[in-house]
């Protein structure tokens, strides 16, 4: 009799353990809100390059600048290289300053010519979630530029956030 009681008790304990494991699994799955935090919660300014006029560097409707481009972001008189010696670039994904309301981007071309693009923007603090914290979005309010190889620049989508859309169109003269 004792053996049968122990076997029943063991089965009851096994059932209770399995029930607890299943409840814990369900509870853990319910707690996961599938938060997908962007790396460093950084929103990037996406600049698409276009050619002015006809170009042999357009393949399937996408223009690629044929030479080397280095892009520097100037903040408080200091420069940081944000894109180094890109060859065949068709788009740029560049960080935006949290503290300034105008970013100064210096484009250095391989032939020694430089251009400067001034991106005026407002900063918009954005609460992502308790897991991800805060992020900074930006609203582009204006563009100015030098005219060495940059022919013109246009705002395509003024809101710079986590979405992968083109914010600025930059028209280059070859």
Feature map (PLM): residue ranges:
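N-terminal secretory signal peptides that target proteins for export/translocation
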Residues: 1-12
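Bacterial signal peptide processing site
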Residues: 32-35
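Structural motif
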Residues: 48-63
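Short acidic/polar inter-strand loop motif in beta-rich domains
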Residues: 109-128
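Glycine-rich, aromatic-bearing surface loops/beta-hairpins
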Residues: 123-174
């Amino acid at each position: 009799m004792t053996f049968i009681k122990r076997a029943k008790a063991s089965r009851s304990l096994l059932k209770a353990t399995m029930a607890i494991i299943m409840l814990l699994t369900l509870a853990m799955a319910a707690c996961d809100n599938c938060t997908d935090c962007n790396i460093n919660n950084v929103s990037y300014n996406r600049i698409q390059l276009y050619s002015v006029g006809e170009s042999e560097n357009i393949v399937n409707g996408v223009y690629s600048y044929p030479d080397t481009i280095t892009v520097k972001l100037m903040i408080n008189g200091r420069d940081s290289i944000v894109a180094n010696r890109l060859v065949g670039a068709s788009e740029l994904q560049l960080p935006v300053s949290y503290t300034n309301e105008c970013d100064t981007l210096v484009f250095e071309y391989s032939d020694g010519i430089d251009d400067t693009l001034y991106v005026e923007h407002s900063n918009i603090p954005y609460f992502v979630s308790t897991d991800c914290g805060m992020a900074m979005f930006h609203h582009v309010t204006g563009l100015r530029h030098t005219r060495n190889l940059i022919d013109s620049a246009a705002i395509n989508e003024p809101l710079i956030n986590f979405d992968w859309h083109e914010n600025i169109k930059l028209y280059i003269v070859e």
